[in-house]
């Protein structure tokens, strides 16, 4: 039997009246079931709840056993990057579009969530990616004002990191190094570095393969490469990826889950690697990933 829950956090951005109605219903239902309920401050304000315990996303992560995210996959991604730093399980109620990460139907949420709260659920540990944008110079004089040290920029992603130019439809040149060994150079519109979770997101649109969520692998998918030999590449999740730029790389960016964007300066390189943190995503007991793909991607039924 899985661990049961005592303290439950409710979060998600109050985008519309339907999402807020789900937040409102969940809060009052969980309180009637005698759970300790913590509501994200934005939600509590939007619902005008009184005598309610509110907290920031980080505080919910540290104080709750379970976080319920109401919204779409974008809401889940934004919350998950922070919640993954804490020992908390996460489940989603789909108030978005596709809903790969948000399992529960808002029309049947009480019934489905009741079983989960009894300990009837499946747990998946989804790994994250981290990136550093740092100087590519091997030696920098820290006291030399003519050669100042540029602070490292960092980012985290559940789905993917995307290297891209600021200018739309603009080809860039870069090298890819894997575990300190040269792998390939490329002229393209960019590169997608995706987790198995992200293999059904932007990577899929660029022709990348679908990876099962618990596979320990990282996916590299070229974006409109200027060569027929460029193909998606799947590597071990423990690999370190380094993106290097021979020429002045004006206005290059690294996008993390399309929500955080880091700028790449001249004489900088990008390092991407598996994070030490995991997202503890839980599902109803009857969750089957292949069935999820059938439903969400509209795959046809058996031909014979």
Curated annotation (Swiss-Prot):
Q: Where the protein is mainly located, per its record?
A: cytoplasm
Role of this protein? Involved in the regulation of the intracellular balance of NAD and NADP, and is a key enzyme in the biosynthesis of NADP. Catalyzes specifically the phosphorylation on 2'-hydroxyl of the adenosine moiety of NAD to yield NADP.
Q: Which UniProt keywords apply?
A: ATP-binding, Cytoplasm, Kinase, NAD, NADP, Nucleotide-binding, Transferase
> Which GO molecular-function terms appear in the entry?
ATP binding; metal ion binding; NAD binding; NAD+ kinase activity
> What are the annotated GO cellular component locations?
cytoplasm
One example of a Gene Ontology biological process annotation: NADP biosynthetic process
What EC number(s) are associated with this protein in UniProt? Answer: 2.7.1.23
UniProt binding sites for NAD(+): 73-74, 159-160, 170, 187, 189, 200-205, 259
Q: Which Gene3D superfamilies does the entry link to?
A: Probable inorganic polyphosphate/atp-NAD kinase, domain 1 (3.40.50.10330), Probable inorganic polyphosphate/atp-NAD kinase, domain 2 (2.60.200.30)
Give the family per the record: Belongs to the NAD kinase family.
Active site as annotated: 73 (proton acceptor)
What's this protein's name?
NAD kinase
Localization in the cell: Cytoplasm
Which coenzyme or cofactor does it need? a divalent metal cation
Q: Which Pfam families match?
A: NAD_kinase, NAD_kinase_C
Please give the InterPro entries that the UniProt record associates with this protein.
ATP-NAD_kinase_N, ATP-NAD_kinase_PpnK-typ_C, NAD/diacylglycerol_kinase_sf, NADK
Q: Which cysteines are joined by disulfide bonds?
A: none
Q: Which reaction does it catalyse?
A: NAD(+) + ATP = ADP + NADP(+) + H(+)
